[in-house]
Swiss-Prot record:
The keyword NAD applies. It catalyses: (S)-2,3,4,5-tetrahydrodipicolinate + NAD(+) + H2O = (2S,4S)-4-hydroxy-2,3,4,5-tetrahydrodipicolinate + NADH + H(+); (S)-2,3,4,5-tetrahydrodipicolinate + NADP(+) + H2O = (2S,4S)-4-hydroxy-2,3,4,5-tetrahydrodipicolinate + NADPH + H(+). The gene is dapB. Pathway: Amino-acid biosynthesis; L-lysine biosynthesis via DAP pathway; (S)-tetrahydrodipicolinate from L-aspartate: step 4/4. This is 4-hydroxy-tetrahydrodipicolinate reductase. Belongs to the DapB family.
């Protein structure tokens, strides 16, 4: 039985992950952590997430180290925000707890700080902007499209619910990174357009971020040339698509001793 801790336990992803873990053979929720001074601290996380009492009280991040030690957590799943996630990762790594990181929006410095802590403490971690299986097939397909249609004009469009805090999405940025890594030409990433921009240059790869309603996550990569246009789209209709991938990542990283992995590793797409 893999003992799992979840931070951001009452967030959109965290609560769904906890529900799914309770329904998954071989996994056990042993700790649930949220923000300091949370008004529901001490209440049973199973009851808070609608699965019934499981005997695990909601804890807060200011007591993270104690909670991880006492619970015996082997894997910690984090879907929070960049700054708290870095602190959580450093604490967990120091205690020998493996990590599944789904938080997005890191600066390069935050990402480096987190990865250094993981490497220095010789734990294992998966870090991904999107754990959905379909999205990772989307990513893999982009490698081929960038290689074969590299001379086309390339645009990326993403849409999310009105509550999303970062833009563009981590998934869109990862898609752009994959495209750039597989082009046989120079490219320049830009974000939206405004004013008299002039003729589009061949080097441009533009990301457009849309926000509204309750959209879980839509991503489209467009490759356009004179006379034709190819569009590759992934649409998530519920967070369960992400959660299913997280469960795979938890099982994957639980068997690793050290190293930093991504969802291509989890899904054997490399």
């Amino acid at each position: 039985m893999v003992k799992v801790a979840v931070t951001g336990a009452l967030g959109r992803m965290g609560s769904g992950i906890i529900k799914t873990i309770t329904e998954t053979d071989g996994l056990d929720v042993v700790a649930a952590i949220d923000i300091p001074n949370h008004p529901k601290k001490g209440l049973d996380i199973g009851e808070l997430t609608g699965v019934g009492k499981i005997g695990v009280a909601l804890s807060t991040s200011d007591e993270l180290e104690v909670v991880l030690k006492e619970s015996g957590a082997e894997v910690l799943v984090d879907f929070t925000a960049p700054a708290p996630c870095v602190n959580t990762a450093k604490t967990a790594a120091k205690l020998g707890v493996n990590l599944v990181i789904g938080t997005t929006g890191f600066t390069s410095e935050q990402r480096a700080e987190m990865e250094n802590a993981i490497s220095e403490n010789k734990v294992a971690a998966t870090i991904s902007q999107n754990y959905a299986v379909g999205v990772n097939i989307f990513f893999k397909t982009l490698e081929l499209l960038a290689q074969k249609l590299g001379d086309y004009d390339i645009e990326l469009i993403e849409m999310h619910h009105k509550f999303k805090k970062d833009a563009p999405s981590g998934t869109a940025l990862r898609a752009a990174e994959i495209i750039q890594n597989n082009l046989n030409r120079d490219s320049n990433l830009i974000f939206g357009r405004k004013g008299i921009t002039g003729e589009r240059t061949k080097e441009e790869i533009c990301i457009h971020a849309l926000r509204g309603g309750d959209v879980v996550g839509d991503h489209t990569a467009m490759f356009a040339a004179d006379g034709e246009r190819l569009e590759l789209t992934h649409k998530a209709s519920s967070r369960q698509s992400f959660i299913s991938g997280v469960i795979l990542a938890v099982k994957f990283v639980a068997e690793k001793k050290e190293g930093i992995y991504n969802t291509f590793d989890v899904l054997d797409l490399n």
